[in-house]
């Protein structure tokens, strides 16, 4: 069900509404990867599960000219909608030496011992087989290459749905953030577990940090971001009868709640806490 959600065009459209906070975390992820101090040349980078291209765009904006001249960048995602969006962004922003294509992170088909850096932003908690994806990252990295990941610990665009659902009739349930994280890939919201996954996969020099960020979005845009995982979550927590009776009404209850909290033309805070991890291939 979750993989089906990723392939729907509406997912790519809604995902762009969360791009602002993704851009903020992209800067942190790139900094934590240590790429600015890397002596590896040329820089051969995979933006893995690239989404809307936040990592790649930030790299193009922040790398110095010497690094950009040596850069070879591949943006890969399993969602055709995400790849199309990234291609458009690539052209609009004039990225250097970059390509975007369909890539399955669990079986990439990419060459071994090839990349200096692999970035995977907000995806390891959603891969159907994250251990296979970790093995692939290790395989395709050069010796001394770096994997850098981010995963959500908390995200208020998920948790805000609980009080929204409470305003609806029918005594409907909605999960806490801990329950949502457990529905996805358990453990990627805990620092010690993320470290253990990196080390068990074969990475060394593992660094873990937890970072909180927020940005402001117009209420309408924040409302769209809140709906990103809604079909998947409701499929797990509501009966089919409840979905048939109430699911179509959720967006209107959501907007009424947000407009009451922040005003019809107001700004809503988008808040997240993410685990930033990096590790090196021996």
UniProtKB/Swiss-Prot annotation:
It comes from the Eukaryota. CDD domains: AdoMet_MTases. Induction: Expression is positively regulated by the transcription factors brlA and laeA. Pathway: Secondary metabolite biosynthesis. Pfam families: Methyltransf_25 (PF13649). Its EC number is 2.1.1.-. Keywords: Methyltransferase, S-adenosyl-L-methionine, Transferase. GO terms for molecular function: methyltransferase activity. Specifically expressed in conidia. One of its GO terms (biological process) is methylation. InterPro entries: Methyltransf_25, SAM-dependent_MTases_sf. It is an enzyme of class 2 (transferase). Methyltransferase; part of the gene cluster that mediates the biosynthesis of trypacidin, a mycotoxin with antiprotozoal activity and that plays a role in the infection process. The pathway begins with the synthesis of atrochrysone thioester by the polyketide synthase (PKS) tpcC. The atrochrysone carboxyl ACP thioesterase tpcB then breaks the thioester bond and releases the atrochrysone carboxylic acid from tpcC. The decarboxylase tpcK converts atrochrysone carboxylic acid to atrochrysone which is further reduced into emodin anthrone. Belongs to the class I-like SAM-binding methyltransferase superfamily. This is Methyltransferase tpcH. It comes from Aspergillus fumigatus (strain ATCC MYA-4609 / CBS 101355 / FGSC A1100 / Af293).
